[in-house]
Amino acid sequence: MINITIPTPDVTITKKVNPQESNIYGFTEFHLITRELGGIFMFYNDKDELLYVGKARKLRPRIKKHFEDAVSPIRMHRDEVTKIEVCIVEDPVHREIYETYIINEGKAKYNEDKVFFKQA
């Protein structure tokens, strides 16, 4: 049995109650997410259910793209995202392992790739 410890998030940002404070689906603190470093990110809803897990070589641009892109797997569910957690993981192999592991252990609702559990 492989034992993987999920990293503690380096940054957590939450949707603001007053959406006019932000032009990106209620999130105002994207500046707290590194622009230059790689890692993994998790999107959660207001019940703290895992919605989506992703990885990136440059975190902030990739996360923002999910809220702007017409082909993002969460494009129809952006309003559900109330919390974003970010873990800095510079090694690309480690990012790949963590992403796949978290998708399956957390049963991420909107991930389509790397899914090895049966969706309900």
What are these regions (language model features)?
Residues 1-57, 96-97:
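GIY-YIG nuclease catalytic motif and its immediate N-terminal context
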Residues 36-38, 60-68, 82-120:
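Structure-specific nucleic-acid interaction/processing domains
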